[in-house]
Regions:
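Active-site-proximal alpha-helix that buttresses catalytic centers in soluble enzyme cores
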Residues: 1-207
Length: 207
């Protein structure tokens, strides 16, 4: 699979003059901004692409956060989940200021369902914080869901792996059963639809 830069280079070689790039990131973090900068460089090259627009990732507003959480609750959470069982979303997290979006998402999640939580691998809220709340609430089971485009390395190892520091193992150590959901958000039409809507908006701005 081409990197965004390789794909843009190939499109330039093939004579395309207007290109819309759709980010499949969750938030506008460091990687998103890197793609944004690199994409614009192609529009500045002599004989390059005339216009390049990079569209927004999944979460950029109150509306998109609420829509994403509704998608989680209606499309991703297993139907057998009981109200006293927790749902813990695993976000990637980042040192970029946009990491604050995960805390905002957590706030909205708690307003939607008192047992819906958002943790991150590399940012805030941390899993340690979430685990402490689960213990305090005497939660007996938690569904672990990757809040990521694909259920890749973080989901397989950091979330559902058998190593002592995985989220599943850490919950087991305090007597909480886990129910990992091994699917990324790109496997659900509700989220694909959000990205496609962003792409359509970007394409409408190509002149």
């Amino acid at each position: 699979i081409d990197s965004p830069e390789m794909a843009l280079s190939r499109l330039m070689d093939e004579g395309y003059t207007k290109v819309a790039v759709q980010s499949l990131h969750m938030i506008p973090g460091a990687e998103f901004h890197e793609i944004n900068v690199n994409a614009r460089l192609f529009a500045q090259m002599a004989g390059g692409i005339d216009q390049v627009i990079v569209s927004w990732p999944l979460l950029v507003s109150d509306e998109t956060m609420e829509k994403a959480l509704q998608g989680i609750m209606t499309r991703v959470v297993p139907k057998q989940r009981q109200a006293d069982e927790a749902i813990v979303l695993m976000g990637h997290g980042t040192h970029h200021p946009s990491d604050a979006i995960y805390s905002a998402l957590m706030y909205k999640a708690q307003k939607m369902d008192a047992n819906l939580f958002v943790g991150t691998v590399e940012g805030s809220p941390s899993f340690e914080e979430i685990k402490e709340v689960l213990v305090r609430k005497k939660i007996r089971k938690a569904y672990l869901i990757p809040f990521m485009t694909v259920a890749g390395d973080h989901a397989m190892n950091d979330m559902a792996g058998n190593e002592p520091d995985s989220w599943k193992s850490q919950l087991a150590s305090v007597g909480i059963e886990s129910g990992p959901v091994m699917k990324g958000l790109a496997e659900f039409d509700a989220f694909v639809g959000m990205w496609i809507a962003n792409l359509k908006t970007a394409m409408a701005h190509l002149k």
